Amino acid sequence: GQDFGTAMTQTIFQPLGLTNTYLNVPTQKMSDYAWGYNKDKKPVRVNPGMLDSEAYGIKTTASDLSTFVKANMGIFPLDNTLQVALNNTRKSYFSVGKMTQDLIWEEYAMPVDLPTLQEGNAPKLILNPTPVRAQEFSAKPSSNVWVNKTGATNGFGAYIAFVPEKRFGVVLLANKNYPNAERVEIAYK
């Protein structure tokens, strides 16, 4: 087996051409590494912690994250093993309301309105126990869906959304943890 960092670098980052994506930012790239700002407006970086690499430790650029979104939409050819792995991250497991929870992503059938997206990305839903319904697996990911994921740490906030059928995606990276509702609204517009 490999450690997580080596596995991510060799099987995901390098094959996708993510040249500015790291678990540990190299010394020569530290001047490009943005400072985040916490709620007290003090500069912060992502703190090391238990499972930090696995849970929240990837540092990237908007360009590399856009490449990752394109790969998830199947816009460019990939090694079959990697494409199957990316497709598997979009297999639906559970649903709650109009949101379907995949392995990584959340999905909403199109058309979808802003209040539905905001509700599905609200702290109330994310942080509290919520009854769900099990889903049957489909052979391949749906294409006429809004796929999204929020992410944040103390000083950073991110939001990714894409609609595979339209071959359209949005990547938002901020060096402040803005509320999910604001991130979703910006992407939706």
Explain the meaning of each model-derived region.
Residues 9-10, 14, 45-189:
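Catalytic loop of the DD-peptidase/beta-lactamase superfamily, centered on the K-T-G motif
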Residues 2-41, 77-81:
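Active-site helix/loop module of the DD-peptidase/beta-lactamase fold
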